[in-house]
Amino acid sequence: MLTLEELKAEVKADRIDTVVAAFPDMLGRLMGKRFEANFFVDGAFEETHGCNYLLAVDVDMEPVPGYKAASWEKGYGDFVIKPDLATIRLCPWVPKTALVLCDLLDHHDHSPIPHAPRNILKRQLERLSAMKMKAYFASELEFYVFDQSFKEAHAGGYRTLTTPSHLNEDYNIL
C-alpha cells in the first residue's frame, strides 16, 4: 500500500507514470480510468466521473434493459468515481502503474450509489459491526481455458467453446 504522499514521491521519481482508478462492476470486473500520474496526483485524486451505464451492462458492455437506475428510457447520466486513497498500491503486472480502488457516488448529492458493489459490501460490513461481528474474506479464483480467442468466442455467441482437454482438470497437480 502507498499513501498519497508516497505515490507523489514515486511519480516525481518517475517510477510511476500511470494511475488506474477502478471500481468493481456488477460482474466483478474492474472498470474505471487510467490517468497520467502527474495529472492524478495534481488533483484527479479528489474525484472523477463516469457514465452510470457501467453498472447496467452485460459481459459485452451492452446495456441491459430493466435497470431502475440507468436505462435507455430513463437516460444515462454520470456518477462520481471517488478514489479511496487508503487502497493505493502498485500494480505489479503493469510496469510503472499504481491502482486505487474507488467508490461510486451520486453525481448530484455525492451520496453512495446503493447498488454499487463496494457500497453494498460497506453496508453489510456496517451491519456486521453493529452486531459485534467481523467478516473475513478470501478470493477463490476459478476460470476455464478455451481453445478459442476472445474474438472467436464473441463471434460464436460464447456457444460451443472447446477446452484443451477432455477432462475436468480442477485440482489436478500434473
Label every model-predicted segment.
Residues 1-174:
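Glycine-rich, acidic/polar active-site loops that bind/position phosphate-bearing ligands
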